Amino acid sequence: VPVGALVATAAALAIMIALAVVSVRRVCREPVAALLRSVPPRRGSVRLGVLEAMLVAAAAAAFIALVTGSVGGAIGQIAPTLLALAVGVIAARVLSAGLAAAGQRLLLAGRATSGAALLTASRRGTTRWLVPVVTIALCIVVVTADSLAVGARNWSDRAAAEVGAATVLTLDSADLSAVTQAVRSADPTGAHVTPVAILHPTGQDATTTIGVVPASFGRIALWPGIDTASLPWDKLTAPTTPALVVTGSQISYHVVVPAVKVVGPAIRPAPTSLALALRVVRPDGSLESVPLGTIPATGIDADQTVGVSCAEGCRINGIGILAPSGAAAVSGTVTLTQLAMDGRALDLGGAPSWRAPAAVPAGATPSGGAEVTAAFADGSVTLTFDNNGADKAFLAHASVPDVVAAFTTPVSTPSASAATFGGSYVDGSALLLGSVGRVAFVPGGPAAASIVNLDNLLAQGWRGRGSAELAAYLDSADPDVIATVTTALQANGIDVVATRHAAVLATAYGETAAAWSLKLALAVGILAVLVAGVGIVVLASTARRARSRDYAALRLVGQGSRGLALLAQLETAPVVVISALLGAAVGWWAAPSAVSMMPLFPTPSATFPLDVHPASAAALVAGLGGLLALTLVGVATSHAVARHADLQQLREAG
């Protein structure tokens, strides 16, 4: 063989080997992740396209306008959807880059199937459509579930707040004392029934006084959204001094009175006589001043006997002096000894049994009202008085409330700290109140209401007028329980004129036009899942040919059916799950803004504040249900694509 031929052959062989090396050198230098593709690789950038950026900006601007109140009403309810749209478009870009990075790490770790699946998912165009579809759907599901649960909660809570208890019996009696005794006979421990007095004011801007038994009212009344255990019930006090009750028809005593003094310039005529008097509460609760004898202005030292109408018992409310109307102001002292009722010694008690006038702080100006003080000794009492021109000057018994502690609603709370304000007894007479705590509302009461201890209202004036409403609150709607209580009340001469149930009113609220429009959210949520499911199927069908061809190639190189099915499912399931979780999070965050714009009631409540905080349980269950449903759809469609991947796909492609 000629040497030239050998050289030519060797040269040709070397050139062919060099060409082969050069041709595969670039491919060999590429990472495995870059070779696993059936389409040209996309850039790993998360930058948005022009149309995507415009869409995100418009959706974000609309959402901000909605939640800031620039737009409201029915249009405002789409705020979560707009936010989900913006988040979904951005997430589609970010998720593609994230899937690519995760796939590369899995390949480097030797997990070929899962790594290849994530890389393929990051490169498929359908992923960019799948993410916003699922994100919006799950956002709608969570918002609709939350709105339904929040609506149902508010229907129930508003009914509870407006009715006041599970069952409220309105009674035909205006006698609070009789009602209290009848209720206690029906339930001596107050475990299930409690009396309530609702005393509406005569003035439009005044507060409604609501008398309750604190221990049982806090337990039996319905307080949606309020932690009753945190309320300072111990501050709703009533006088602890026992009432001073006398029975008889004649009072006798010895009285010593020096000449009274006219106080200040005598612009008005000086009185020629005064009268010692008792202020008593009659058995019907009415308040009356009973004169006990005349006291000449020049003084007296004598025994006195006077008839009184207390055969059925009188509760002594105060002791003091009566003066003629329009007379000059006078002051003096009255000393009583040998005080007796029908010949029996009458003990007025000591100083602790009577309420001393409020002390005037140093440097402060006296109030200028009538003032009576008392000094007690064995068998005698000395009254020192200055009537300041008033026709009545009494020292009050300690069993009579002074400034009554009250829980007040925001409307009834005075603006000045520690200020007093006017309430009323059952008969409409004035009762001085002071706020010791605030409540958002009073169960069964109006917007301007004050809760007081019922015992204060039983001190006097316990027989009501037309605007006084006496009721019994029950902790049960059981007909047998209601019948038992009604029978016990009737046995005491008290009939039930009306019965209200919180559950019945809640049902009525749930059947209003506003409620039915809200209930349509259930159909919207279901429809959102169906549309998203159809979207997953359509996107899978769009990419089915390319995916089947890829899977057929893998089958050709020895990949088994189970491996192909797993790879196909891993392409779709992570995208669906991540998008669903993202949509649920968006819905959870945006739901309160949307629900606050939804009309839950035909008319707003004057007392109950709406509670739109998210309903955690309902939103979680709905979100998990939507996530499971869409994941199953994605897995099923991917499995179907993998099952149809056979070598025929490669022949068709060739």
PLM segments and residue spans:
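Juxtamembrane/transmembrane-helix interface segments of polytopic membrane transporters
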Residues: S579, G583, G587-L600
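Basic-flanked hydrophobic alpha-helices used for secretion and membrane insertion
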Residues: T180, V193, I198-T202, A206-R500
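Juxtamembrane segments of multi-pass membrane proteins
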Residues: V71-G72, Q77-T241
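Interfacial "coupling" helices/loops that link adjacent transmembrane helices in transporter permeases
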Residues: E30, L35-P40, V534-V576, Q649-A653
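Selective detector of the "anchor" transmembrane alpha-helix that sits immediately C-terminal
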Residues: A10-A14, K519-T542, I578, G623-T631
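Alpha-helical transmembrane segments, especially those used as permease/efflux helices
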Residues: V1-R29, A33, R37-S147, T572, ...
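A hydrophobic alpha-helix feature that marks transmembrane segments and, especially
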Residues: V21-V24, A145-D146, V524-Y551, L564-A568, ...
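Peri-transmembrane interface segments
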Residues: V71-A79, T484-A532, A543-R545
